[in-house]
Amino acid sequence: MSRNVNKANSVLVRYQELQAAETGGYQDFSRLKRPTRINKVTKLDEALRWRNELVKEIGQRVTQIHDPSLNESQITEINDELNKLFQEKGRWDFHIRNKLKGPDLKKRKQLNTTGGTLIDGKRYFGRALELPEVQKLLRESKEQREKERSGKEKKAELQRKIKRWESTLKDDYFVGNNSDELLEYEKKRTGSLRSTIHSSDRDPSFVIPNFDVPSLKDVELWLVQRRKNELKKQLGL
């Protein structure tokens, strides 16, 4: 009997809510299912109320996932639900801000709706961080950060060594150096060489002797004669 009474009361409440919604009165959003097609919600106040219900559900799930009596399967399931709820929250925030020209709710920090540890694009809350596979991901993430930090430190140390080394180099190391001392030396040395080679007030340092260049026929005769002399020497003539 009581079951029928509760069912009748539930139907009556739903009927009263529908009547109130039609007349612009109070509507209990907590008793209704959130719309899956967010873009169909065209009123800002309605969208904000749906989002508030979503935030409440996120808070409930965050509290639930800290329950010490949950097994690993239940923890994983709740954590997956939380990730889906956060994705839905992001869609509501975008719709309210960009489509309905409402406030930017992403900048607001609300209790139990932020936090968690983000690993490879997924959030982990409460006891989900104790799961073996999550612990493995945390270790791998830590090792990767240490490698990146070590690589950056090595690169920075190498840059410091290069700067110290460059500071010890003299001007004559660099090609195209234009230091005053080097330019002055080049000027004097160039003048000295020019005066030695192209001097007009003295004889050249050496004279190339004049001689007749032998013709091809002369060379051939010389080779034949040399061959004859070698044969005579071998024969003892």
From Swiss-Prot:
Example GO biological process: generation of catalytic spliceosome for second transesterification step
Main location: cytoplasm
Highest taxon above the source species: Eukaryota
Localization per record: Cytoplasm; Nucleus
Coiled-coil ranges from the UniProt annotation: none
Presence of the UniProt keyword Nucleus in the record: yes
Pfam family, one: Isy1
Keywords of the record: Cytoplasm, mRNA processing, mRNA splicing, Nucleus, Spliceosome
SUPFAM superfamilies: ISY1 domain-like (SSF140102)
GO CC annotation terms, alphabetical: cytoplasm; spliceosomal complex
InterPro entries: Helix_hairpin_bin_sf (IPR029012), Isy1 (IPR009360), Isy1_sf (IPR037200)
S-S bonds: none
Subunit text: Associated with the spliceosome.
Homology family: Belongs to the ISY1 family.
Function summary: Involved in pre-mRNA splicing.
PANTHER family: PRE-MRNA-SPLICING FACTOR ISY1
Protein name, entry field: Pre-mRNA-splicing factor ISY1
